[in-house]
Amino acid sequence: MSKQQYNLNTKTDYLNRKMFLDPAGPVTVQRFEEVKYNKLVKYEQEARGFFWVPEEISLTKDAQDFKDASDTVKHIFTANLLRQTALDSLQGRGPAQVFTPVISIPELEALMYNWSFFETNIHSRSYSHIIRNIYNVPKDVFNTIHD
């Protein structure tokens, strides 16, 4: 059984829809010329304004500090990064997977996908960036994430 994502022939008045579980179904065409909740648009715009790329940050000093750290500090630091990677992989995907099928307005859908993007991509990429810069073979470190 396949589930139809949306029907382009369905005209939707998002200004009169519930935020979740509207009888008309999920968001079809994302239209933002008029929105029901301007505050959600502002939150989403603000979140996009915080966009950054981990590779923009130099970790030269951090890599040296890590080399000079004790084995205990290295273990705690690395274990934390691995757990943060696992956590953000889950918490970024989970809410989007659960809520987007029942979201009924485009401004909330956009905010949810933005949040998911930051959690799964920016945060996890940041941890990878750190590990790549402090370990010679980052793959060996990431391969221990399930240990």
Where do the model's predicted regions map?
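Non-heme di-metal
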Residues: 2-147
